[in-house]
């Protein structure tokens, strides 16, 4: 992604050791934040002819059915095993039904803005908003419930997924040089102590 060099040392260390070493700061003001600061919604950043939303649906769903003449890009239906709840959800594209499955920014964009993304270039913010590392297809209601919460204010109901979820948040924040708030770091350490050897995801 433009202008960002993923940290190499962190990829072999545990998430717990990495978060324990982080210096914390309070959230910056939300002043200046808009979704537009992160570029067009669901851009085709990897230039594969398919927008990011459909790329993630393709990655996370099974039994995909595609819209004709879209070169297996536009997903019209499929099955999601929601990582946040463990529920199986049948996705059907439509004005209302599409909301059943939403694409979650693991580190919410407004949260990222308040923890350092306001310092990034426009291209770096666009990369963050479309990075598969920071995106998951999830149950729509839980995505709405999460809002812009961090690990201190919201965690997936499915406890067995919390280590993966928190590890992914850490990986995103390290990659884009975002900081952690004290309550967020405390919550992450508490979760990762249940899986102390877990490494951070890279994709």
Regions inferred by a protein language model and the residue ranges of each:
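Homeobox/homeodomain signature
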Residues: 6-9, 23, 28, 46-47, ...
């Amino acid at each position: 992604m433009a202008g960002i060099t993923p940290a190499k040392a962190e990829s072999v260390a545990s998430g717990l050791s990495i978060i324990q070493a982080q210096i914390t700061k309070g959230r910056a003001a939300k002043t200046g934040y808009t979704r537009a600061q992160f570029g067009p919604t669901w851009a085709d950043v990897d230039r594969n002819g398919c927008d990011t939303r459909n790329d993630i649906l393709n990655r996370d769903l099974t039994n995909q059915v595609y819209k004709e003449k879209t070169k297996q890009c536009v997903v019209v239906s499929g099955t999601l095993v929601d990582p946040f709840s463990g529920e199986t959800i049948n996705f059907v594209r439509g004005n209302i039904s599409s909301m059943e499955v939403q694409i979650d920014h693991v580190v919410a964009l407004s949260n990222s803005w308040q923890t350092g993304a306001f310092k990034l270039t426009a291209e770096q913010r666009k990369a963050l908003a479309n990075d598969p590392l920071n995106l998951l297809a999830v149950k729509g209601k839980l995505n709405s419930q999460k809002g812009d919460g961090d690990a201190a204010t919201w965690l997936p109901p499915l406890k067995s997924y919390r280590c993966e979820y928190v590890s992914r948040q850490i990986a995103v924040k390290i990659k884009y040089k975002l900081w952690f708030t004290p309550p967020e770091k405390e919550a992450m350490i508490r979760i990762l102590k249940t899986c102390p050897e877990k490494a951070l995801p890279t994709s």
